[in-house]
Swiss-Prot record:
UniProt-listed Enzyme Commission number(s): 4.2.1.59
Active site: H46
Major localisation: cytoplasm
NCBIfam families, A to Z: fabZ, PRK00006.1
Class in the EC hierarchy, top level: lyase
Matches recorded under InterPro entries: FabA_FabZ, FabZ, HotDog_dom_sf
Protein's job: Involved in unsaturated fatty acids biosynthesis. Catalyzes the dehydration of short chain beta-hydroxyacyl-ACPs and long chain saturated and unsaturated beta-hydroxyacyl-ACPs.
Name assigned to this protein: 3-hydroxyacyl-[acyl-carrier-protein] dehydratase FabZ
Classification via Pfam families: FabA
Annotated disulfide bonds: none
GO MF annotations in UniProt: (3R)-hydroxyacyl-[acyl-carrier-protein] dehydratase activity
Length: 147
């Protein structure tokens, strides 16, 4: 799935869209890609002279990739937000630097209606750099919330 299709699912835009491509997608799993470049705005201050992608943004990239998976499983997702509800078992294993390709792998552990619990792992060159369990839910469309 290319960036145009991803943007059809996610409301995020530059500089906060953190998934560039979907490499694999099934009804239970997704694999995404984030090309990490020196042009990322966060590298200006994190850290000058030794740029490292902030761990919370690795988690956000995982969450966005999981959002694409969730939205593909809901037929009437248009106009509905996805809310990040929580994270557990978060671990950062290695730094992510400019030039890295971040591979984002998520698998549904549990689904109850519009709520999803997913295992999430991020890799660089087949080495685990971060992992977590993420919880998210698809909310009501704005028109439904205003009614």
């Amino acid at each position: 799935m290319d960036i145009a299709k991803i943007m059809g699912y996610l409301p995020h835009r530059y500089p906060f869209l953190l998934v560039d491509r979907i490499l694999e997608l099934t009804s239970e799993e997704i694999v995404g890609l984030k090309n990490v470049t020196i042009n990322e705005p966060f590298f200006q201050g994190h850290f000058p002279g030794e740029p490292i992608m902030p761990g919370v943004l690795i988690i956000e990239a995982l969450a966005q990739t999981g959002g694409v998976l969730a939205f593909t499983l809901v037929s009437d997702f248009r106009g509905k937000p996805i809310y990040f509800m929580g994270m557990d078992k978060v671990r950062f294993r290695k730094p992510v630097r400019p030039g890295d390709q971040l591979i984002l792998k998520l698998k549904i552990l549990k689904r109850r209606g519009p709520t999803f619990k997913m295992s999430a792992e991020a890799f660089v060159e087949e080495q685990l750099v971060a992992e977590a369990e993420l919880l998210a839910t698809i909310g009501a469309a704005k028109s439904e919330r205003e009614a």
